[in-house]
Design a protein with these regions (language model features):
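Walker A/P-loop NTP-binding active-site region of P-loop NTPases
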Residues: 52
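Residue-level signal for the "D+5" position in two-component response regulator receiver
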Residues: 27
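A generic "binding-loop/recognition-motif" signal
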Residues: 55
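Metallocofactor- and cofactor-centric catalytic cores in central/energy metabolism, strongly enriched
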Residues: 48-49
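ATP-dependent carboxylate/acyl-activation modules
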Residues: 1-24, 34, 40-43, 59-132, ...
Length: 280
């Protein structure tokens, strides 16, 4: 699990605030692997974890061993989810992502989506959970299939922010599925969603354009300490670029003496000694 630890540290260093843990792969024991990864990641980084599984037994075991307050991804109005996942969330004091789906599948329109959000919210309150336990998924679809997908998601985000006073989350990559140069679409979607009140996004923090846009958007909206965070990020990126350029132009002993045979080994040594590189 060395790779898992390395990825977790890299994600945190690049700005992730929560790490989503999903072990839903063919050919593995999901419950056992989920336990191992939670142990490794929670002891490696400071970020809280989001437990991402559709299996009830895996979710309960993950919450049982996690040394903190986790975020469940996700609970919907689907019968099995709301009847079994909500009690587990309450039992272990977890927060949860409210996914506006029902047994009928995707909501037909914005009004049905609001109805699902309200119904799941009310059920959670009846069970004794708190308002602060819930994060609503904007449920964004791909614009390749629905040209109004982005607008519908923005309306859900605004409704949760202005009417329900609930934080929101969405998966960025969904919006651009099947399109060329997806990063530009994802970045534009993110900045507009932040303006509507989006709280969190499921994304890869190593994507520099995306993260820079998020930090800049927060600053333009005058969110607390956003100016300091933006400046600190830009300074860190500038330092990394300067260090990278220093490594690239530095001559190795073999290059200085014309000994081409050993220059490959010298280059790998230089990369190994540099903090932002990993030799493969």
């Amino acid at each position: 699990l060395d790779l898992v630890r390395e990825m977790a540290m890299a994600q945190e260093e690049n700005g992730a605030r929560i790490l989503d843990i999903n072990m839903g792969m063919n050919g593995i024991d999901e419950k056992e692997m989920m336990k191992q990864v939670i142990y490794e990641v929670s002891s490696t980084v400071d970020c809280p974890l989001c437990i991402d599984t559709s299996h009830i037994d895996v979710m309960e075991e993950a919450l049982r061993i996690y040394p903190g307050r986790a975020l469940i991804n996700s609970i919907s109005l689907e019968s099995e989810k709301i009847e079994k996942m909500l009690p587990i969330a309450k039992k272990y004091g977890a927060m949860f992502v409210l996914l506006p789906l029902s047994d009928e599948g995707l909501p037909k329109d914005g009004e049905e989506k609001k109805h699902i959000i309200e119904t799941v919210y009310d059920r959670a309150m009846e069970m004794g959970m708190a308002h602060e336990d819930i994060v609503v998924d904007g449920l964004v679809a791909t614009i390749g299939a629905n040209p109004e997908a982005a607008r519908e998601c923005y309306e859900t985000i605004a409704y949760c922010k202005d009417v329900r006073k609930l934080p929101t989350i969405c998966g960025l990559s969904n919006i651009s599925f099947g399109l060329p140069e997806r990063m530009y679409v994802n970045t534009a979607f993110l900045t507009m969603a932040i303006c509507e009140g989006l709280t969190m996004a499921i994304a890869n923090p190593s994507q520099e354009l995306l993260m820079n846009a998020a930090f800049a958007s927060d600053m333009l909206l005058h969110r607390p300490d956003s100016d300091i965070r933006y400046i600190e990020r830009m300074n860190r990126l500038a330092e990394q670029k300067a260090e990278y350029e220093t490594v690239v132009v530095k001559k190795t002993p073999a290059e200085s003496t014309g000994q081409k045979e050993s220059s490959g080994a010298d280059a790998i040594d230089a990369i190994k000694d540099h903090p932002i590189f990993t030799a493969v």
